[in-house]
Each structure stands twice: as C-alpha cells, then as structure tokens.
Design a protein with these regions (language model features):
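Conserved nucleotide-binding/hydrolysis micro-motifs of P-loop NTPases
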Residues: 193-194, 236-238
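Short secondary-structure junctions
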Residues: 4, 161-166, 210-215
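Conserved catalytic/switch belt of AAA+ P-loop NTPases
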Residues: 201-223
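N-terminal nucleic-acid engagement/recognition segments and initiation subdomains in replication
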Residues: 1-109, 113, 179-181, 213
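P-loop NTPase catalytic core of nucleic-acid-dependent motor ATPases
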Residues: 70-188, 195, 200-201
Length: 238
C-alpha cells in the first residue's frame, strides 16, 4: 500500500496507493498500523516504529500512467507509477438487454451496418488486454437531439470515468498539455469544426495514426508518451 517518495527536510515521505496522498510521514504509517496490532498499548508506538524501520518500501515516481485492467501501482521501465485507471462500477451482465442501445445507435447513425461497426469497435476496446488502439477516429455530426450526448454518457458508464476523457472543443488537442488528452481509452471532443487540410486536421490525423508520440509538457523535457485514446468527435457540422 505504501511506497517511498523522497527524503526532504529530515523526513521520509511516502505515497499511499489507497488514498493517493503523496506527502505522508512515518507517523501516518504508524497510525495505520495501530488498527492491525494486538499488542499492548505500552508497546504500540515502539512496535509500529520498528515495523516501519525494518520495511523496505518500493520507490515510486509520482508521474501517473494509464494501464487498463492493471493494479493501482504498475511497473514500467523498472520504475513504479500510480495507475490512473479505475475499474468501472458497472459490471457486465449477460442477461442485460442490449436492444435499446443498439436501436439508439441505429437511429443515431442512420442504419444497422454503421451501428454494428461501431459496436464491434466498442467491444474490441472493452475486451482488449493490451489497450492497443485501432487507428480509427469517429466523427458524429447532427443537430440537438441527435443522441451524441447519450452515447458519450453510456460510454463513460460502461468503460468507467477513468477511461474516458471529455473536452469541450478541439482547442484542447493543441494546448501545451494536449498529450494528456490522449492518455485514456477514449477521448471525446464536443463542438468540433475541423476543415480538411487545416492545421487542426493534420494534427488530429497524426495523433490518431500513432500509438506513441514525443512531446514536451510544461516543465518537462521531450520524451515519448503512449497515446492509447481513440478519438470521438461530436459536431453540429457535416
């Protein structure tokens, strides 16, 4: 549960994988041990201190990564990182009736073959163990009441909130932190208006077609980032 972060000001700081707190001192660890001990009150503090002193804590790098279906803490390139993915609250139910959702997609997209294609893609991303994205983006256009919002909400419920990144418009795809927009299973952009051949169009095309990308986030050097998110664009324009 606890990982070593760093030494600062004469204190050792720890990260708690359960709460996400990253500035815990040894006293916090002592307090958590009190609830799991059966020795007398007089020995309580000394025993807790001894346990912490004799424990080797794995060092963690606090830059989180996104790894679906893996533990709260994952190892990558010999380093331990917090995992942003969380298991969705909604569980698969073989007895559930999928017809309302299929009918909704059929009406939204105009025909059954298009709905079937989208459903196959959703099933692949849900069942995939390695989170490798197909180099396919979706562009849904239509006026109010078209059903785009219902689809986005359903996606969030099925895959879990941690798997879906929702942004207001395409400006988020070109900000200094845009690389983080792609570190999910799905990225949903509302109010898109992109013209073929434009700078935004070419940037989106590049990101959709790649699985890793070199970028310089604010305060960081250039380095390689995984970008597993598949893009869904909603628009009122054809």
């Amino acid at each position: 549960r606890y990982f070593f972060v760093k030494q600062t000001g004469g204190h050792t700081l720890y990260w708690d994988s359960k709460t996400g707190h990253s500035n815990l001192t040894s006293k916090h660890l002592h307090q958590s041990l009190y609830a799991y001990t059966d020795f007398g009150e007089n020995d309580l503090v000394k025993r807790a201190q001894r346990i912490v002193e004799m424990t080797t804590f794995k060092p963690i790098i606090l830059e989180s990564i996104y790894k679906p279906k893996q533990a709260r803490v994952v190892q990558q390139h010999d380093h331990w990182h917090p995992n942003d993915w969380r298991e969705p609250e909604l569980k698969p139910d073989p007895q559930a009736d999928s017809k309302p959702f299929v009918d909704h997609l059929t009406r939204m997209l105009g025909n059954k073959p298009k709905a079937d294609y989208l459903i196959d893609m959703l099933a692949y991303r849900y069942q995939s163990e390695d989170n490798t994205k197909p180099h396919v983006a979706f562009y849904f256009y239509g006026g109010q009441g078209f059903g785009k919002g219902i689809f986005s909400t359903t996606l969030e419920k099925v895959f879990g909130e941690s798997a879906v990144r929702k942004v207001i418009d395409q400006n988020a795809l070109k900000s200094i932190s845009s690389i983080d927009v792609w570190k999910r299973t799905w990225t949903i952009v509302d109010e898109v208006d992109v013209k073929a051949g434009s700078t935004d169009y070419n940037r989106i095309k590049t990101m959709v077609g790649g699985s890793t990308f070199d970028a310089e986030r604010k305060g960081e050097h250039f380095k390689s980032h995984e970008i597993p998110a598949q893009l869904i664009m909603n628009s009122n324009h054809a």
